C-alpha cells in the first residue's frame, strides 16, 4: 500500500515537472529560436553522420553553415523587439545581448569555410569538429543572454568543454596535447574560483540567483558595501579573467594558440572574448552596481597590464601564432577600456564597434596563416620572408589585416581604436588612453616588421619553405580564400563608413 502511494506521488510529481517544462518551452521557446536552430542543426549532423558515408561530407559543411546563417537571420528579424525575461528568469533577450550573439554567430560562420581544407589535409574527424564548433557557439549564445548565476556558470562550461576538445583535436601532436592539458587544468581552476565568487554573492543577497534580484537582496540585507561583496568581486574577476585572458590571467593563451589547430585558434581567439565581454559587462554593472569604484580599479589594472605586457612580449616572438596570442592579450586591454567607460559615454558602443572590426582583422590574419601553413608546413615568422614574390595576393591580404590590427589609417582598426580611445578620454580615463596609444605604436612596430619581411625579403633571407612555395589548386582552397577576402574587405572598407555601425551599436545599449 505504501509503495503504491509513493508510486502515485512519483507519477504526479513527474507529470507536474513535465507539464512545467512543456509550458516553458511552449511560451518561451520563441525567445530562443536562434538557439533552437543550432540545436536542430546539431541533430541533423548526428543523423547524417550515422546514416551516410564519406561522400556526404559536403552536406555536413552545408548544414553547419546553413544553421548558422539561419540563426543570424532569426536574430536580425527579432531586432528592436521589447526586452523580455524568460524561462523563470534564467534568460534575457534584448538588443545588447543579441548583438553579442550576432558577433559570435558571425565568427562561427566565417570559421567553418576557413576549416574545410585544413580538416581534409590533416584527416581529422569532420563531424565531431563541426559538432564541437556548433555546441561551443550555442554555449556562447546562452552565456550572452544568461540572467542568473547558474546559467552564467553552465553556459561557459559548455563552451569551455568544447574548447578543450577542439584544442586537443590533433591527438598525435605533442604540442596540442600539452596545450590541452594546460587549458583544461587552468580552466577547471578558474571555474572553481568563479563559483566561489558566486557563492559569496548568493549568500550576501539572501539566497538570490537572478542578477537584478541579487541587487534587491543586497539592498534588503544591507550587504551591498560589505567585505563579502569585495571578496565576491575579486573571485569573479579572476574567474572571468581566464575567459578574457588579460594579463596576468594570460599564461594559457600562448601555449594554446601555438599547439592547437590553426582554425581552432581562429575560432577561440574571437568567440571566447566576445562571450566573456558580454557576460562581464552585465555582471559588473548589475550585481556590483554599488561597487563600481572597486571594479573600475580592478579592470584598469588588468587593462594596463594587458596592453603593456601583451604588446611588449609580442615583439620577441618567432612563431606567428604566439605573436598573435600576445597581440590578442593587448587587444583585450583596449576592449576593457570600453567596459570601464560604460553606458554614459558610449563606452559599450565603442567596445562593440571595435569588437566587430577585431573579428574581421583577426580572422583575416588567421585565414592567411592557415593558407600559408597548408602550403609550407611552417609557422615561423622568418619563413614568411619574400612571400610577396611567390603569392602577392596572400601577402597583401596578410599585410592589410596586420596593418588594421595595428590601427593604421584609413583601415577599420584605426577608426575602431580612435572611437574607443575618444570615449575613454571623454570619460576621464586619460592615463589608460595614453597607455593605449603608446602600446598601439609598439604593436605597429612588430606588425610592420612582419610586413617588411613579406615584401622585401632578400634572396639570402628566403627560406626553403617560400622558395619551394606552390599554390594549391583553386578548387580546394577557395573556401579559405572566401573567408579571407570577406575579412580583408571588412578590415578596410568599414573604416570609411563608421556612422551606421556606431548607430547600430548605440541602439543596442540597455
UniProtKB/Swiss-Prot annotation:
One of its GO terms (biological process) is photosynthesis, light reaction. The chain crosses the membrane at residues 24-44, 57-77, 99-119, 124-144, 149-169, 183-203, 227-247, 295-315, 323-343, 354-374, 395-415, 418-438, 484-504. Signal peptide: none annotated. GO terms for molecular function: NADH dehydrogenase (ubiquinone) activity; quinone binding. It is found in: Plastid, Chloroplast thylakoid membrane. InterPro entries: NADH-Q_OxRdtase_suN/2, ND/Mrp_TM, Ndh2_N. Keywords: Chloroplast, Membrane, NAD, NADP, Plastid, Plastoquinone, Quinone, Thylakoid, Translocase, Transmembrane, Transmembrane helix, Transport. NDH is composed of at least 16 different subunits, 5 of which are encoded in the nucleus. This is NAD(P)H-quinone oxidoreductase subunit 2 A, chloroplastic. It comes from Solanum lycopersicum (Tomato).
Amino acid at each position: 500500500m505504501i509503495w503504491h502511494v509513493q508510486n502515485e506521488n512519483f507519477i504526479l510529481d513527474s507529470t507536474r515537472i513535465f507539464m512545467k517544462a512543456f509550458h516553458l518551452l511552449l511560451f518561451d521557446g520563441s525567445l530562443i529560436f536562434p538557439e533552437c536552430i543550432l540545436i536542430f542543426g546539431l541533430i541533423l549532423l548526428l543523423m547524417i553522420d550515422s546514416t551516410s558515408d564519406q561522400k556526404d561530407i559536403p552536406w555536413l559543411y552545408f548544414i553547419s553553415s546553413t544553421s548558422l546563417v539561419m540563426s543570424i537571420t532569426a536574430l536580425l528579424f527579432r531586432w528592436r523587439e521589447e526586452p523580455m525575461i524568460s524561462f523563470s528568469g534564467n534568460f534575457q533577450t534584448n538588443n545588447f545581448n543579441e548583438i553579442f550573439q550576432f558577433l559570435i554567430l558571425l565568427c562561427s560562420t566565417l570559421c567553418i569555410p576557413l576549416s574545410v581544407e585544413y580538416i581534409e589535409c590533416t584527416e581529422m574527424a569532420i563531424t565531431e569538429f563541426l559538432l564541437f564548433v556548433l555546441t561551443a557557439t550555442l554555449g556562447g549564445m546562452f552565456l550572452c543572454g544568461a540572467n542568473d548565476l547558474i546559467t552564467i556558470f553552465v553556459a561557459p562550461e559548455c563552451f569551455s568543454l568544447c574548447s578543450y576538445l577542439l584544442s586537443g583535436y590533433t591527438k598525435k601532436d605533442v604540442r596540442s596535447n600539452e596545450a590541452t592539458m594546460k587549458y583544461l587544468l587552468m580552466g577547471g581552476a578558474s571555474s572553481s574560483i568563479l563559483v566561489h565568487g558566486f557563492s559569496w554573492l548568493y549568500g550576501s543577497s539572501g539566497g538570490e540567483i537572478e542578477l537584478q534580484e541579487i541587487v534587491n537582496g543586497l539592498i534588503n540585507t544591507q550587504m551591498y558595501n560589505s567585505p563579502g561583496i569585495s571578496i565576491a568581486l575579486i573571485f569573479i574577476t579572476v574567474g572571468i579573467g581566464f575567459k578574457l585572458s588579460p594579463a596576468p590571467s594570460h599564461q594559457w593563451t600562448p601555449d594554446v594558440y601555438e599547439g592547437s589547430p590553426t582554425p581552432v585558434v581562429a575560432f577561440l581567439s574571437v568567440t571566447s572574448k566576445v562571450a566573456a565581454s558580454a557576460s562581464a559587462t552585465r555582471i559588473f554593472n548589475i550585481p556590483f552596481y554599488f561597487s563600481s569604484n572597486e571594479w573600475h580599479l580592478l579592470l584598469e589594472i588588468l587593462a594596463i597590464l594587458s596592453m603593456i605586457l601583451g604588446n611588449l612580449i609580442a615583439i620577441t616572438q618567432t612563431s606567428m601564432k604566439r605573436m598573435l596570442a600576445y597581440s590578442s592579450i593587448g587587444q583585450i586591454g583596449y576592449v576593457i577600456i570600453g567596459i570601464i567607460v560604460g553606458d554614459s559615454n558610449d563606452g559599450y558602443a565603442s567596445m562593440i564597434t571595435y569588437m566587430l572590426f577585431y573579428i574581421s582583422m583577426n580572422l583575416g590574419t588567421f585565414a592567411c596563416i592557415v593558407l600559408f601553413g597548408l602550403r609550407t608546413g611552417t609557422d615561423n615568422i622568418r619563413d614568411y620572408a619574400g612571400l610577396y614574390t611567390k603569392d602577392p595576393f596572400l601577402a597583401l591580404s596578410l599585410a592589410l589585416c596586420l596593418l588594421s590590427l595595428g590601427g593604421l589609417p584609413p583601415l577599420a582598426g584605426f577608426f575602431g581604436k580612435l572611437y574607443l580611445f575618444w570615449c575613454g578620454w571623454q570619460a576621464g580615463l586619460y592615463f589608460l588612453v595614453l597607455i593605449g596609444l603608446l602600446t598601439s605604436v609598439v604593436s605597429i612596430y612588430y606588425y610592420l616588421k612582419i610586413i617588411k619581411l613579406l615584401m622585401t625579403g632578400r634572396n639570402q633571407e628566403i627560406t626553403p619553405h617560400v622558395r619551394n612555395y606552390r599554390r594549391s589548386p583553386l578548387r580546394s582552397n577557395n573556401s579559405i580564400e572566401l573567408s579571407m577576402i570577406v575579412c580583408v574587405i571588412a578590415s578596410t572598407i568599414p573604416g570609411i563608413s563608421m556612422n551606421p555601425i556606431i548607430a547600430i551599436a548605440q541602439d543596442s545599449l540597455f
